[in-house]
């Protein structure tokens, strides 16, 4: 697994520096399809040391088909034009109905995933690299990987634009601060 940077939810905007805030804005722009994400893709593929292997790149389904195409169409085009060793799986997935956006759903790991997609392409025997915007709990990734494997593909790597930073419980933060204060 590779990721390009750390994602801080917008509620922490006042607690992070300008550089991190700029990264988070770029991630939002990627999610909205306003930037292509090619630099993130290239950096993560290089970090994985894929060595020009003939991987099939599949993109994580979104909450609706329009978002899916908008978010990943330029990476799909880049792969087709500039990465002859790779194939794009953009059209291997049919996002057939809308669902609530997972980041908007409260409850984190307790949420029940509603599968709003089906794999329609022939991925039998292909080595798959999954691309997504953000990893938080990994629940949707696990579900997607299982579905890919059920259809005969083998997931060999996953790349994310960002990894959500999780804060430790407030009690642990207070204990660490007070512990250092009491020792000194």
Summary of predicted features, one role per range:
Residues 63-66, 97:
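A short acidic, glycine/proline-enriched capping/turn motif at secondary-structure boundaries
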Residues 1-56, 94-124, 164:
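Active-site-facing substrate-recognition patch
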Residues 54-64:
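Short glycine-rich phosphate-binding loop at a beta-alpha junction
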Residues 92, 100-184:
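PRPP/pyrophosphate-binding module of the type I phosphoribosyltransferase fold
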Residues 54-56, 87-90, 155-157:
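Residue-level recognition of the N-termini of beta-strands and the immediately preceding loop/turn
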Residues 65-69, 137-138:
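Loop/helix-junction capping segments adjacent to catalytic residues or to phosphate/diphosphate-binding pockets
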């Amino acid at each position: 697994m590779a990721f390009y940077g750390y994602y801080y939810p917008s509620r922490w905007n006042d607690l992070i520096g300008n550089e991190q805030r700029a990264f988070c804005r770029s991630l939002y722009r990627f999610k909205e399809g306003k930037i292509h994400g090619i630099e993130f893709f290239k950096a993560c593929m290089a970090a994985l040391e894929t060595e020009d292997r003939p991987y099939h790149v599949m993109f994580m389904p979104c909450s609706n088909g329009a978002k899916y195409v908008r978010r990943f169409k330029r990476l799909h085009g880049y792969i087709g034009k500039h990465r002859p060793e790779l194939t794009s799986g953009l059209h291997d997935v049919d996002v057939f109905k809308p669902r609530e956006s997972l980041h908007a759903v409260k409850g984190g790991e307790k949420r029940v995933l509603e599968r709003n997609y089906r794999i329609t392409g022939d991925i039998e025997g292909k080595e798959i690299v999954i691309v997504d915007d953000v990893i938080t709990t990994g629940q949707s990734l696990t579900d997607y990987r299982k579905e890919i494997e059920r259809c005969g593909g083998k997931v060999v790597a996953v790349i994310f634009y960002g990894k959500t930073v999780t804060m430790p419980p407030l009690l642990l933060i207070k204990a660490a601060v007070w512990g250092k204060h009491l020792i000194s």
